[in-house]
Amino acid sequence: MKLVSWNVNGLAACKRKGFLKSIARLRADIVCCQEVRTNCPLNTPEYLQYWNLAEQSGYSGTLILAKKEPRSVQYGLGIDQLDCEGRLIALEYD
């Protein structure tokens, strides 16, 4: 299994710079993105998409692209002061 973590520092700008081609080249099973800041549409038919965006538009946010469906998905820690920033997604696999 290949897992990649990428701080994209704004997914919309990263997408314009070839994000999708880079993801294809990496051939990762799971791609974890931080600081996505937006929910710009991604055409990734080979990946399931799990988004956790901040309540404040244009701020923080995370995205996980996964080739296999997880057993469970957790968004946040259950602490409102932290979860409003969209900083955590946990996927659980067997």
Feature map (PLM): residue ranges:
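Structured beta-strand-rich core segments of catalytic domains in phosphoester-bond hydrolases
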Residues: 37, 42-94
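N-terminal, active-site-proximal structural segment of metallo-dependent hydrolase catalytic domains
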Residues: 1-44, 54-59, 75
